[in-house]
Amino acid sequence: MNNTIYILGAGSIGSLLAYELASLKSINNRVILLLRDKSRVNSFKDKNSTLKIDRLFEENVPHLCCQVTASEPSQLNVQSIENMIVTTKAGQTENALSKYLPYLSKNSNILFVQNGMGAVENVCGKLWPEEQNKPSIYQGVISHGCFQTAPFHFSHAGLGDLKISKVPKNPKKILPDEAAETPCEMIKSLGKSELLRLRYMNYPELLVNQCEKLVINACINPTTATLDCVNGELYNDESAKELFRCIIKECVDIFFKCIPLFKNNEEAEKILNVNRLLDRVMFVGTKVNGANSSSTRQDCLLLRETEIDAINGYVVKLAENNGFQATVNKTMMLLTKSRLGLNRCRAHAR
């Protein structure tokens, strides 16, 4: 059995997970970063194959460094991949993952840890249309704040947690034996990192937490991107708080109208309460992660495509697919796209 853990996506979250895993004695050198191409691998080697992490929530801590092996599709010399963590942007997942299809089988375990919702269902449906060939799929929801400050150098700005569940074959009809399944060894390895603070849960519980995270992102990401600010600058802003309430109210309304698992679900009603969520956005989003620059803001600053279609755009699409409208979230989505377009025009005009 090959227990190597391959991490597809070397952005802030992928690199944070790679660092935490590679730092475990039980893992040793069994972590491999899967990068885009040879030039990206060579760039990493020029940095001595080292990931650097700064923990902004800890005082007087020097750069944390860890060497990790990197590879890319044409350099991979293995027969199979049994354990993979996917942290690519939602819109890039299908293309990135398809390059590794020859190495993945029904015996593989794949954990998706990404912003937004909807990408996993879409990608798995396209890449594995036949259920019997599909790998075991796990979904992760992470609340750690992390952003890139230089190539392969990241700031861990907010201490959060990592929630994981195995995705059932039919999420709308979960069998009792699926709900009771124990996690695979890859998930257990993540649990050995004290800093990641992993919680393993059943799928309905994770779905509620996934929606909670989506709401936080739907507030913080487009607002910080459009206003070009770090999270903490919104902490005492009453106008931002009023805007967040409008976003949250619409998200919650759409979730309960459109997600069957939330019907008569006391946990969902408790977690996805508008006032509670507003408190969470202000606490987790603007205080705990106050020093963080959201991924969407970073993308806009670096003129890269954002994940806004999988965040506010997911709420818009969920609403429209069920005959409703999500005008507040659509406005935030369009403002973010306009911000990116404006930044690109300004950069081109220089």
Curated annotation (Swiss-Prot):
PANTHER family: 2-DEHYDROPANTOATE 2-REDUCTASE (PTHR43765:SF2), 2-DEHYDROPANTOATE 2-REDUCTASE-RELATED (PTHR43765)
Binding, NADP(+): G9, A10, G11, S12, I13, G14, N115, E307
Annotated GO CC locations: cytoplasm; cytosol; mitochondrion; nucleus
Main enzyme class: oxidoreductase
Family the entry assigns: Belongs to the ketopantoate reductase family.
Example GO molecular function: NADP binding
InterPro entries: 6-PGluconate_DH-like_C_sf, 6PGD_dom2, ApbA, Ketopantoate_reductase, KPA_reductase, KPR_N, NAD(P)-bd_dom_sf
Function: Catalyzes the NADPH-dependent reduction of ketopantoate into pantoic acid.
Keywords attached to this entry: NADP, Oxidoreductase, Pantothenate biosynthesis
Keyword presence, Oxidoreductase: yes
Pathway where this protein functions: Cofactor biosynthesis; (R)-pantothenate biosynthesis; (R)-pantoate from 3-methyl-2-oxobutanoate: step 2/2
Residue pairs linked by disulfide bridges in the UniProt entry: none
Name of the molecule in the record: Probable 2-dehydropantoate 2-reductase
Short name of one Pfam family: ApbA_C
Entry EC no(s): 1.1.1.169
Lineage: Eukaryota, Fungi, Dikarya, Ascomycota, Taphrinomycotina
Organism encoding this protein: Schizosaccharomyces pombe (strain 972 / ATCC 24843) (Fission yeast)
Example GO biological process: pantothenate biosynthetic process
NCBIfam families: apbA_panE
